[in-house]
Swiss-Prot record:
<keyword id="KW-0442">Lipid degradation</keyword>
<comment type="similarity">
    <text>Belongs to the 'GDSL' lipolytic enzyme family.</text>
</comment>
<feature type="signal peptide">
    <location>
        <begin position="1"/>
        <end position="23"/>
    </location>
</feature>
<protein>
    <recommendedName>
        <fullName>GDSL esterase/lipase 6</fullName>
        <ecNumber>3.1.1.-</ecNumber>
    </recommendedName>
</protein>
<dbReference type="InterPro" id="IPR035669">
    <property type="entry name" value="SGNH_plant_lipase-like"/>
</dbReference>
<dbReference type="InterPro" id="IPR044552">
    <property type="entry name" value="GLIP1-5/GLL25"/>
</dbReference>
<dbReference type="GO" id="GO:0005576">
    <property type="term" value="C:extracellular region"/>
</dbReference>
<feature type="active site">
    <location>
        <position position="326"/>
    </location>
</feature>
<feature type="glycosylation site" description="N-linked (GlcNAc...) asparagine">
    <location>
        <position position="107"/>
    </location>
</feature>
<feature type="glycosylation site" description="N-linked (GlcNAc...) asparagine">
    <location>
        <position position="50"/>
    </location>
</feature>
<dbReference type="GO" id="GO:0016298">
    <property type="term" value="F:lipase activity"/>
</dbReference>
<dbReference type="GO" id="GO:0016042">
    <property type="term" value="P:lipid catabolic process"/>
</dbReference>
<dbReference type="Pfam" id="PF00657">
    <property type="entry name" value="Lipase_GDSL"/>
</dbReference>
<feature type="glycosylation site" description="N-linked (GlcNAc...) asparagine">
    <location>
        <position position="296"/>
    </location>
</feature>
<keyword id="KW-0732">Signal</keyword>
<keyword id="KW-0964">Secreted</keyword>
<feature type="active site">
    <location>
        <position position="323"/>
    </location>
</feature>
Length: 362
């Protein structure tokens, strides 16, 4: 067996062991602030009644919460698992916290989840669905900081998690819109917003920053809706575009410590992590890495889970995908473990555990 194969096998065994072992750390992180899309969304869309991108109906949430919470999966998301590993309560969505704070029943002390499923880096991405774009998420955070509702010392020690862009790239290939930019120019427009995002959170006090890559967007079951996408394999053109974005994103993340004094940053290689699940499914407990557990039609990708006429699998833990676009809790668990204490194939220059325990001098 080659050394690389041995390393892959060792890593998969580590990912499959009890999450309790991985969750123990001497973290110095008092709070987590999360921005992005459905990989993180804890229910903001549910509290946004103008938003049509919803997962607030069964069987969403059925495997862990036993009720829908607004998360676009059957249980916990990456943000939830990382909160558990750090030793913090699960993050609440900003729009829920806002209501509770007005009622005097909560505060922002453990962090906030601003993510909105369906959103992107570009303002026009799914705008018609009423999602909250990254620009608005950042403005929500900025308002809290300017109103002194979050202590500066807490912000500086907190973990900032960011992941967005998959909806931008998927939408580039929608049949009813003609792209006005080349793939290269479109990706650069996305990355312009990445730079603005990092600049804004740094000015607001962020110092521990984790930016995650996109996964293989061209493999989601929802590609069955696209007339030019293959269903017997992943959509290559879409994945090429995602990898282009990821490569340039990593270059941006790598210079954060130089460009922003006092900041430390890591790049989570979500694409590579997911690709390993697809390449060695049995090692990670998967029997199906192509079809949605919950949905209907080709690949289970022609209908959203929970809508009239949907079908659901018997064991979601054996599926990579929960619905037409989103992974199962099992996938998120494995992904989160790789990001938390994985090696440089998964996250670099060091993992989230190191980022959370690293002492920062201001």
């Amino acid at each position: 067996m080659s050394s690389s194969s041995s390393m892959d096998l060792l890593m998969c065994l580590l990912l499959l062991i009890s999450p309790v072992v991985l969750a123990k750390s001497s973290s110095t992180v008092p709070a987590i602030f999360t921005f992005g899309d459905s990989i993180f969304d804890a229910g903001n869309n549910h509290y946004n009644k103008n938003c049509t991108a919803q997962a607030d109906f069964p069987p969403y949430g059925s495997s862990f919460f036993h009720r829908p919470t607004g998360r676009f999966t059957n249980g916990r998301t990456v943000a939830d698992f990382i909160s558990e590993f750090v030793g913090l309560p699960l993050q609440k969505p900003f729009l829920e916290l806002q209501i509770q704070i007005l009622n005097g029943t909560s505060n922002f002390s453990n962090g906030i989840n601003f993510a909105s499923a369906g959103s992107g880096l570009l303002l026009d991405t799914n705008k018609f669905m009423g999602v909250t774009p990254i620009q608005t998420q950042l403005q929500q955070f900025q308002t809290l900081v300017e109103q002194n509702l979050i202590e500066k010392s807490i912000i500086q020690e907190s973990l900032f998690l960011l992941e967005t862009g998959s909806n931008d790239i998927f939408n580039y290939f929608l049949p009813f819109r003609a792209p006005t930019l080349s793939p290269d120019a479109y990706v650069n427009a996305m990355l312009d917003q990445v730079n603005k995002t990092i600049d804004q959170i740094y000015k607001l006090g962020a110092r521990r920053i984790a930016f995650f890559s996109l996964g293989p967007v061209g493999c989601v079951p929802a590609r069955a809706m696209l007339p030019n996408a293959p269903t017997n394999k992943c959509f290559g053109k879409m994945n090429v575009m995602a990898k282009m974005y990821n490569k340039r994103l990593e270059d941006i993340v790598n210079i954060i410590p130089t460009k922003y004094p006092g900041a430390i940053a890591v790049f989570g290689a979500v694409y590579g992590i997911t690709h390993r699940f697809q390449t060695y499914p049995a090692r990670y407990g998967f029997s199906d890495v192509s079809n949605a557990c919950c949905g209907n039609g080709t690949l289970g990708g022609l209908m959203q889970c929970g809508r009239e006429g949907y079908k659901i699998c018997n064991n979601p833990n054996e599926f990579l995908f929960w619905d037409f676009y989103h992974p199962t809790e099992h996938t998120y668990r494995l992904m989160s473990k790789a990001l938390w204490n994985g090696n440089k194939n998964h996250i670099r220059p060091f993992n989230l555990m190191a980022l959370a325990t690293n002492k920062i001098t201001f």
